Amino acid sequence: MQMPNLHLGALLSGSLNSTASHLVTLPKVIIKYEQKDITSDIQPYLLSVSYTDYLEGQSDEVQVELEDVDGRWRQKWYPEQGDKISLEIGDQINGMLKLGSMELAEIEYQHPPSVITLKALSTGITKSNRTQRGRAYEHTTLADIVRRIARRLHLKVTGTIRHIPIERVTQYQERDVEFLTRLAKEYGHTFKIVGRQLVFQANDALAEQKPVAVLLPEDIKNFRLRDLIKGVPQEAVVSGYDAKRKTTRRTRRRSKALRPGGKRASSGDTLKIVANRGESQAQVNARADAALANAQQSQVAGNFSMVGNAKLVAGQVVQLKGFGKFSGKYLVKQARHEIRRGGGFTSDLEVKMVEYVPDEPPQATAATQPKKQAAKNANS
């Protein structure tokens, strides 16, 4: 992108700020392109900016949508390969969320009307994490494997990793990122790379967090929540071969009910977990427990849209209150924050329930007391 003293940096604190306001919040965005502030330069062309934060499986993403009536974004301002974008997004009430540098990954042109969309991702594809590897890890732990791969990728490990002994696990000609993604899923963790950090976090540790916000129905613009009545496995059968005793071993693992005291989901489904060669019983049990927990936390899930709050990000817990049987603590799987010209500042969250928290029953009054109690009061 050839611009004198321009490289995409501080964005949107002008035109969108003046048009996209709310009763309690005034949105603000700052973008840097190759560490240079170009807010005032691109302000006349800016249609929207969005940031999507994923819990796992995908790189975080920034999209900048620009008018291109005169063709400058297709020609002299056309971005160059490897350019970096950084972003700050937020408002005057909740504060700003500062993101790290992201690498430009895609440029889209559509017409009519003539619009250019820039997409940037939080991680670039480097030679080290493209390499396919085949090897076995023996007599180690999950944490040790993660740290070993992080050193190979020159990344710093962050997050809480549960102590899970690993007798043997094999990397089957997989890229390191693919292998870590599989390990995380199999052993109840989430994984992604953010900048120079390798985030590997136990799912139960995420679920145990205190809610960062308590949301009532009136706090949400629209929502969709669903509860799977059937199809949620309640049990896992673990089978494997005991080489020493030369017998087949089989154990059963049960999940905890999402709503304690309530009727368990109607399901005859049972997960079947088969031990791989060299796996210990503790190792395969950990895989079974992770599979059950993942299935259970997928039972109640959904998404909702609310007035923008960039401080709500993937991996946090929010509590929904006043939603009846849907009330409870929810883990944020994905958060998308968007400021759009004429459309204001919105946050869209994808969530799953990690703990049911019943609503407090209304306090009894004289008008709502049971008839028996009312009669007793009359005779006293």
Can you describe what each PLM-predicted range is?
Residues 1-125:
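Assembly/oligomerization scaffold segments
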Residues 1-21, 215-224, 364-380:
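Compositionally biased, intrinsically disordered low-complexity segments enriched in polar/Pro/Gly
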Residues 2-9, 115-124, 161-224, 230:
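Short beta-strand-centered interaction patches in the first periplasmic/extracellular domains
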Residues 78-80, 97, 135-143, 169-177, ...:
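Solvent-exposed, acidic/flexible segments
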Residues 89-91, 202, 316, 322:
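Conserved "cap/hinge" positions at secondary-structure junctions
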Residues 101-110, 204-207, 331-342:
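Short, compositionally biased
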